[in-house]
Amino acid sequence: MEALEVDDISPALEVTEEFFSTLDSNLEKAVQQAEVYGIQEVPELVGHEVLSNITDNGAMRNVTSLGKGGMIWDHCKSRLLETKAQNVFPAKEQFMVQRGTTPDNLSWMEQKEASTFNFFNICQRRRDRPRSVNDLLDETSTFKPGHARSRSDITQVDWRVVLKTTPLQQQQQQQPLLQGPHVTRPSFLLPSPNKIEDAQGNTEHKQTFPNILKKGYLEIRKDHDSYWQSCYAELSPYNLYFYSLDSSGNQNLYATYQLSHFQSISVLGNLEARMVDTVLYDNTQLQLKAESPWEALDWGQKLWEVVHAAVPGYMGRQNELTISPGLGHHDDYTQNHSFQKKTSGLLPPSPVLDSSKQYQNILKSGTLYRLTVQNNWKAFTFVLSRAYLMAFQPGKLDEDPLLSYNVDVCLAVQMDNLDGCDSCFQVIFPQDVLRLRAETRQRAQEWMEALKIAANVARSSEQNLQVTLRNKPKDQMGGHELRKNKRQSVTTSFLSILTTLSLERGLTAQSFKCAGCQRSIGLSNGKAKVCNYSGWYYCSSCHVDDSFLIPARIVHNWDTSKYKVSKQAKEFLEYVYEEPLIDIQQENAMLYHHAEPLAAVLRLRQRLKSLRAYLFSCRAAVAEDLRRRIFPREYLLQQIHLYSLADLQQVIEGKLAPFLGKVIKFATSHVYSCSLCSQKGFICEICNNGEILYPFEDISTSRCESCGAVFHSECKEKSVPCPRCVRRELQKKQKSFWQRLNMDESLEEACTMFELSYQNT
């Protein structure tokens, strides 16, 4: 090997000597200095003697962590002495403050020369030394701040603004309850001058991410029963974004939470482990967990500050920062940093949706209880927008709404004191009367006011629209849209009670008004006619005694009679007459045992489903011929328990069974005559007589429900276990099982070792 030249060795020797000389001097300074800005940092090389001296001098009052707890090497991976110096040197000017306070930045800027060992200068001088001629051309400017920051905190702080602000605890002690339109924003949301000199005298530094206040890797979960999920989080002045990470490390937007949705923010745990627990507007939880307890505390405090400043419309709120210590000793006690917002006002948060563009113009949302047709209260999440009042299942806002009403056709909003409850109210629509109940009377009043305001705004917008369109007559302008929206609302309401027996709730529930045209009915105003489908009352114009089959009566009672329904109900039933919306197995499976015509149709559909597997695996022309014969009711081939109202009427009249019999006859003749389909039969594995069996021969054959094997009905009735299921269970046995099995013993002792999970049929 060629010897190294002196020029190749001298830079390394120079850096090494400079490094250790600076190390010795700064270690001496660190030991001599008893207190740095009121917070003491103890290097690990000093030993227990220095630690005991500092403790005796009372300098440990503000110590929050030692050793690796005061390092930033885990986040600032320096290329120089990364492994050796990690446990030796304290972090560069890392200020360790009490939770809930801000660091003394002025002292840090003025006494920069007296800080602890600054290893970044060495790294910078080593990096500034040119390595080659090309490096001289690519050499950049001097070191800029931000390189040694935590990878989850990228906030560029305007230090002049921060130095003028008061600490967080002082602000909470001095600032009274917010009144009026003025809201104090935190320092990171205040505008800064054009050129501000930072802590290192650099005036050319610009914010890399001006709209992102904090970002990093977190673990989130919805509640205590769910699993933690790793994600990448970004905190902006008005939203909290979560990105999912795939196997390649790519980030995809997972969910977006508006900061106005947060009702309370708490930091739970102790010094070793902490997590941020938040409660949203609909009482759902969102928990965040960071890499370290201090990172979790920083996330919680910064999230609270941004939530406090993001929505200036919440004027009647009281913001609190409480620290409630739990049981424990000294520094190991559990602390709960709670940042809460107590709301009192009409401005509500909108629902938490994965896509912020899914619903626009949300006015109010929350949990209300609706009186169902079974006369019980059921909780729903109601969302009020400028156009609709929607009801969702609790915690499932990403799904389609269960109920939807047009706000512009709302007739009245009034209190409901029939049950003696002061938090009940009614929302009257042309097609339905909603009886709702809130948690408190004040919450009910807020909902009533919001509904009235939304209805008035919707009506005024329609009037303004008519003026802008050259004053068209009301019957010509928007009449089609109004009828379309009304029909959609009626369809949604009637569809939810398709298989529910109707109950008459009385005229008082409708305020003695017709459910169709809102004309006064009852007493001297006219006769009220009840609709046997919905249970609502109508006038003589909206109810002309039309008769129709009631799906709920057929499903639950096998009542095949026709009953009088209103015009709206008849229109709806005719609209869904041929739609497969009724699942007998799900609604009332015992109906097959009580209705023989329906049981006969079930057996035919089971045979047809078995034949479908044969014909659809044959030539394409054969499958197309089967589709043509069954069109447009292909669900009869696949889902044997699904029926439409027309199918049920054909079952009652005895027309569906002959229709299915013709299709089965065509399919059976094809299987017996086709050279491909006829070879797909079964052999009875119990008797093994060689006869070819087919599963659609339901009279002479029986099929195993577990594996699908086909046997003779006489063989299966002998209570012999399925041979195929036995083989599959034995194949799952491990090798040690067969080694322990001694076939030389008696047969009974050997058979006791077999524990099979199949059903003994």
Swiss-Prot record:
Biological processes per GO annotation: myoblast differentiation
Zinc fingers (Phorbol-ester/DAG-type), renumbered ranges: 669-722
Top-rank taxon, per record: Eukaryota
Span of domain PH: 211-308, 361-456
Main location: cytoplasm
InterPro entries in the cross-refs: DEF8, PH-like_dom_sf, PH_domain, PLEKHM3_PH_1, RH_dom
Molecular functions (GO terms): zinc ion binding
Intracellular or extracellular location(s): Cytoplasm; Golgi apparatus; Cell membrane
Keywords: Cell membrane, Cytoplasm, Golgi apparatus, Membrane, Metal-binding, Phosphoprotein, Repeat, Zinc, Zinc-finger
One GO cellular component, as annotated: plasma membrane
Residues with the Phosphoserine modification: 132
Quaternary organization: Interacts with AKT1.
PANTHER family membership: PLECKSTRIN HOMOLOGY DOMAIN CONTAINING PROTEIN, PLECKSTRIN HOMOLOGY DOMAIN-CONTAINING FAMILY M MEMBER 3
Described purpose of this protein according to its UniProt entry: Involved in skeletal muscle differentiation. May act as a scaffold protein for AKT1 during muscle differentiation.
Name of this chain's protein: Pleckstrin homology domain-containing family M member 3
